[in-house]
């Protein structure tokens, strides 16, 4: 029987970290065996590559030293000849002969030794570079079959093998989105003004989740600066009583603040659960877990107690675990009874352990927003990670490096995603309550949602859809229409801005007692829209878990050949 996870930190340390390592190693070994990589031949080739690169670095260093010597000798020779010519009537003949002879010897040494050595070293470097390039091409050929076996779902399959009750969808379907709306009260207003860069949907303990990264434009402000230098003269009397003219200058500076489109990207975990259906709160990282003796902890504790005594603050009442209340701080919650049912003593204990640990996990680095049945976790540690899971990142010409990178990359992603779920796993009720659809069966409609369409458009890139005059990033929005042949035509609209140069004159008072117009160049932004289309086809064939990676690739090839499309990404073939 699969056990629930009530202490995600300890489960990661004692179970999942090592289990994922084993799964990743077994997955890579299976891929390598399937690809029939000649490991020894590749190891020999790579050793030759690295030796060649080291030799090239040594030759480059020697070339640098000989070039320095060459420059010094030529400068010395030229100076010597110049001295002999210019000072021929001033210096004794012996000195002139000594200087001239030294210059001649320098030139002879340059022509006989230095330049031939440089030529030889450059030739050796070029030959070695060609040899290394040929060896690298050979290494890529040796690894070609393995590099072809990586796919977009390799990490999610490994995660599902590692963590019980964690399932990933092939792609974010309309049914999954409809379930979030109907069962959990999801509101599509979240997507207004946002474009989905990527999304991974699925179930954990039978409840739906979406890991997504979005781009949003907000009109901010930018300050532009200009300056003007003014000059004037005054008449002054010096200490001797004489009148004189004094010149003055001053640089006047001015600024113009104008609207400026700013773009923000954010990665979130959105999770639906019917537990505590009326509860609303949001919390931000406090950094106070484990700092009970600090002045800030005591101050926050004082204010929370004061708020709890204030009847005007509604339903807020502190739990007996004051350390948890201060560190987790959800004093803006609207329903204390449901909060207490959700955050039991066991949940509080697990959450505090999670907040304190910065070694295995990430500590207190997440926002936790609950809006009735929708929970949103925004972890800081995922903001700099690209969780699109592009398989190109695994490709390498060196088998040993590929093996090392495969584990390290996936272990980093697994840790980041696992600890995004961890705040939810701390709550026992979230694992004890599942939707009726999960209990009594699932009838998943395999049509991709607009989230997936926007992610696909962003995968193809803004450049394909942006307006020719656009000078900013774009927010890509889509609309879809199913075609008679089963494919889908996606219309993409790229919302961006063009800019127009402006010149404003700002009056500034100068030291000469006059007002001056200081020019400031700035830009005014106007919205523009670009358009384009993507043809896509969803591969809805149920995947056999026993299928080999070669069989998966053959299936992908069949889909691309059948649909005449270019790219297969996460069970969707497409062409832009």
Can you describe what each PLM-predicted range is?
Residues 133-276:
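Soluble extramembrane domains of integral membrane proteins
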Residues 70, 89-95, 148, 182, ...:
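Acidic, low-complexity intrinsically disordered regions
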Residues 114-152, 308-329:
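Intrinsically disordered, low-complexity acidic Ser/Thr-rich regulatory segments
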Residues 1-65, 132-165:
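Basic, amphipathic N-terminal segments
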Residues 11-14, 18-21, 25-28, 32-35, ...:
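Alpha-helical context
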Residues 243-245, 256-576:
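Membrane-proximal, solvent-exposed terminal domains/tails of membrane-associated proteins
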Residues 60-136:
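Transmembrane alpha-helical hairpins and terminal membrane-anchor modules
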């Amino acid at each position: 029987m699969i056990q629930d996870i009530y202490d995600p930190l300890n489960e990661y340390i004692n179970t999942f970290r090592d289990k994922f390592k084993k799964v990743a190693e077994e997955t890579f070994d299976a891929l390598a065996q399937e690809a029939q990589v000649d490991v020894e031949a590749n190891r020999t080739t790579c050793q030759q590559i690295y030796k060649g690169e080291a030799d090239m670095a040594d030759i480059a260093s020697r070339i640098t030293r000989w070039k320095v010597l060459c420059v010094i000798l030529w400068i010395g020779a030229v100076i010597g000849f110049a001295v002999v010519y210019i000072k021929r009537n001033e210096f004794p003949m012996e000195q002139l002969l000594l200087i001239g002879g030294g210059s001649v010897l320098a030139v002879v040494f340059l022509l006989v030794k230095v330049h031939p050595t440089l030529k030889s070293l450059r030739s050796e470097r070029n030959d070695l570079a060609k040899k290394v390039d040929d060896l690298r091409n050979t290494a890529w050929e040796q690894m070609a079959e393995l590099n072809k076996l990586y796919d977009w779902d390799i990490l999610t399959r490994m995660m599902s093998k590692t963590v019980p009750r964690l399932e990933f969808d092939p792609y974010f379907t309309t049914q999954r989105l409809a379930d979030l709306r109907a069962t959990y009260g999801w509101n599509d207003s979240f997507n207004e003004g946002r474009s989905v860069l990527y999304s991974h949907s699925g179930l954990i303990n039978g409840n739906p989740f979406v890991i997504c990264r979005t781009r949003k434009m907000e009109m901010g402000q930018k300050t532009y600066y200009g300056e003007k230098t003014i000059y004037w003269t005054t008449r002054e009397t010096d200490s001797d009583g004489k009148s004189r003219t004094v010149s003055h200058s001053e640089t006047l500076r001015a600024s113009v603040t104008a609207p400026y489109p700013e773009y923000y990207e954010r990665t979130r975990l959105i999770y639906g659960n019917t537990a505590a259906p009326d509860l609303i709160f949001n919390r931000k990282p406090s950094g106070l877990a484990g700092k009970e003796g600090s002045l800030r902890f005591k101050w926050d504790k004082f204010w929370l107690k004061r708020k709890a005594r204030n009847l005007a603050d509604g339903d807020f009442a502190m739990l007996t675990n004051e350390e948890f209340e201060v560190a987790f701080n959800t004093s803006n919650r609207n329903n204390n009874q449901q909060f207490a049912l959700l955050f039991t003593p066991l949940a509080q204990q697990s959450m505090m352990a999670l907040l304190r640990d910065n070694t295995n996990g990430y500590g207190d680095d997440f926002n936790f927003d609950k809006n009735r049945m929708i929970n949103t976790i925004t972890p800081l540690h995922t903001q700099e990670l690209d969780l699109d899971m592009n398989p190109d990142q695994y490709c390498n010409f060196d088998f040993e490096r590929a093996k090392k990178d495969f584990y390290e990359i996936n272990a980093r992603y697994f840790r980041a995603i696992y600890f995004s779920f961890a705040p939810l796993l701390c709550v026992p009720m979230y694992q004890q309550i599942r939707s009726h659809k999960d209990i009594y069966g699932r009838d998943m409609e395999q049509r991709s949602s607009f989230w997936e369409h926007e992610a696909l458009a962003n995968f193809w890139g803004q450049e394909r859809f942006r307006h020719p005059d656009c000078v900013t990033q774009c927010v890509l929005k889509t609309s879809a229409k199913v075609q008679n042949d089963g494919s889908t035509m996606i219309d993409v609209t790229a919302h961006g801005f063009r800019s127009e140069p402006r010149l404003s004159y700002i009056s500034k008072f100068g030291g000469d007692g006059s007002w001056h117009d200081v020019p400031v160049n700035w830009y005014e932004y106007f919205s523009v829209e670009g358009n384009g289309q993507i043809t896509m086809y969803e591969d809805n064939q149920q995947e056999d878990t026993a299928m080999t990676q070669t069989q998966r690739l053959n299936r992908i090839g069949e889909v691309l050949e059948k649909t005449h499309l270019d790219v297969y990404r996460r069970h969707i073939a497409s062409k832009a």
